[in-house]
UniProtKB/Swiss-Prot annotation:
Expressed in osteoblasts and chondrocytes. Residues 137-196 bind DNA. Changing residue 34 to A: Inhibits its transcriptional activity. Induction: Up-regulated by BMP2. The gene is Dlx5. Residues 1-49, 198-253, 270-289 are annotated as: Disordered. This is Homeobox protein DLX-5. One of its GO terms (molecular function) is DNA binding. Residues 32-46, 206-220, 242-253 have a biased composition (Polar residues). The modification Phosphoserine is found at residues 34, 217. It comes from Mus musculus. InterPro entries: Distal-less_Homeobox_TF, Distal-less_N, HD, HD_metazoa, Homeobox_CS, Homeodomain-like_sf, HTH_motif. Keywords: Activator, Developmental protein, DNA-binding, Homeobox, Nucleus, Osteogenesis, Phosphoprotein, Transcription, Transcription regulation.
Length: 289
């Protein structure tokens, strides 16, 4: 037991304890395989040098560019005496990774601000809750003056539909907007159609609608004279028309009896018979000859 232990102890060298892990150069050189740990040589450091010294193993002489690709990254290896050497690491900003990120990041932050601006400009309509249901608040109704209503009514009697120039002219003359005039005509037409559908006579066709000062009573007689004067003149063609002693009020009541037959009897009872007044007038006219 002691003899075997003594034979293997000298194979372990003090320089091998300085490298805690085997270098990659030892794994790439199959010619240096040994039962003990491999030794570091000067040729191992030349493989990772920036100048690209003579490589070993299966690496070709033209593979010196692989060593240059490792320059920007930090790499640490152990030399012959166990001293550590390495290359300084470069930041990500040197390779241009940070600038595109900030460029797109700034654009991403600007896009929501641009889209949110039009949303603030659009004003939402006022909504009021009625019986637990949302309802939009309607605009107040337009109150027309009597002058405006009379002018609109007269124009509606002429034509129920207005052209665009006519509507603009009428709205300007009345101090209204074209929309208000259009809505008034639409409402008026729908009202007329509804009345005619129900069979009622629209107020526009009544005599009082065209002229508010018109009278619905029958026309009065043109000449204020009694009806019997024509008979007295027929008997005496050469006689002058006599002057009537009957008052205009009595003659009007007598003529109105024909308009109201029900009241004719009551009127005739209060008036004297026409022959009693006309007979002395005829005798007086005959004395002129």
């Amino acid at each position: 037991m002691t003899g075997v232990f003594d034979r293997r102890v000298p194979s372990i060298r003090s320089g091998d304890f300085q490298a805690p892990f085997p270098t990659s150069a030892a794994m790439h050189h199959p010619s240096q395989e040994s039962p003990t740990l491999p030794e570091s040589s000067a040729t191992d450091s030349d493989y990772y040098s920036p100048a690209g010294a003579a490589p070993h193993g299966y690496c070709s002489p033209t593979s010196a560019s692989y060593g240059k690709a490792l320059n920007p990254y930090q790499y640490q290896y152990h030399g012959v005496n166990g001293s550590a050497a390495g290359y300084p690491a470069k930041a990500y900003a040197d390779y241009g990774y940070a600038s595109p990120y900030h460029q797109y990041g700034g654009a991403y932050n600007r896009v929501p601000s641009a889209t949110s601006q039009p949303e603030k400009e659009v004003a939402e309509p006022e909504v009021r809750m009625v019986n637990g249901k949302p309802k939009k608040v309607r605009k107040p109704r337009t109150i027309y003056s009597s002058f405006q209503l009379a002018a609109l009514q007269r124009r509606f009697q002429k034509t129920q539909y207005l052209a665009l120039p006519e509507r603009a002219e009428l709205a300007a003359s009345l101090g209204l907007t074209q929309t208000q005039v259009k809505i008034w005509f639409q409402n008026k037409r729908s009202k007329i159609k509804k009345i005619m559908k129900n069979g009622e006579m629209p107020p526009e066709h009544s005599p009082s609608s065209s002229d508010p000062m018109a009278c619905n009573s029958p026309q009065s007689p043109a000449v204020w004279e009694p009806q019997g004067s024509s008979r007295s003149l027929s008997h005496h063609p050469h006689a002058h028309p006599p002057t009537s002693n009957q008052s205009p009020a009595s003659s009007y009541l007598e003529n109105s009896a024909s308009w109201y037959p029900s009241a004719a009897s009551s009127i005739n009872s209060h008036l004297p018979p026409p022959g009693s007044l006309q007979h002395p007038l005829a005798l007086a006219s005959g004395t002129l000859y």
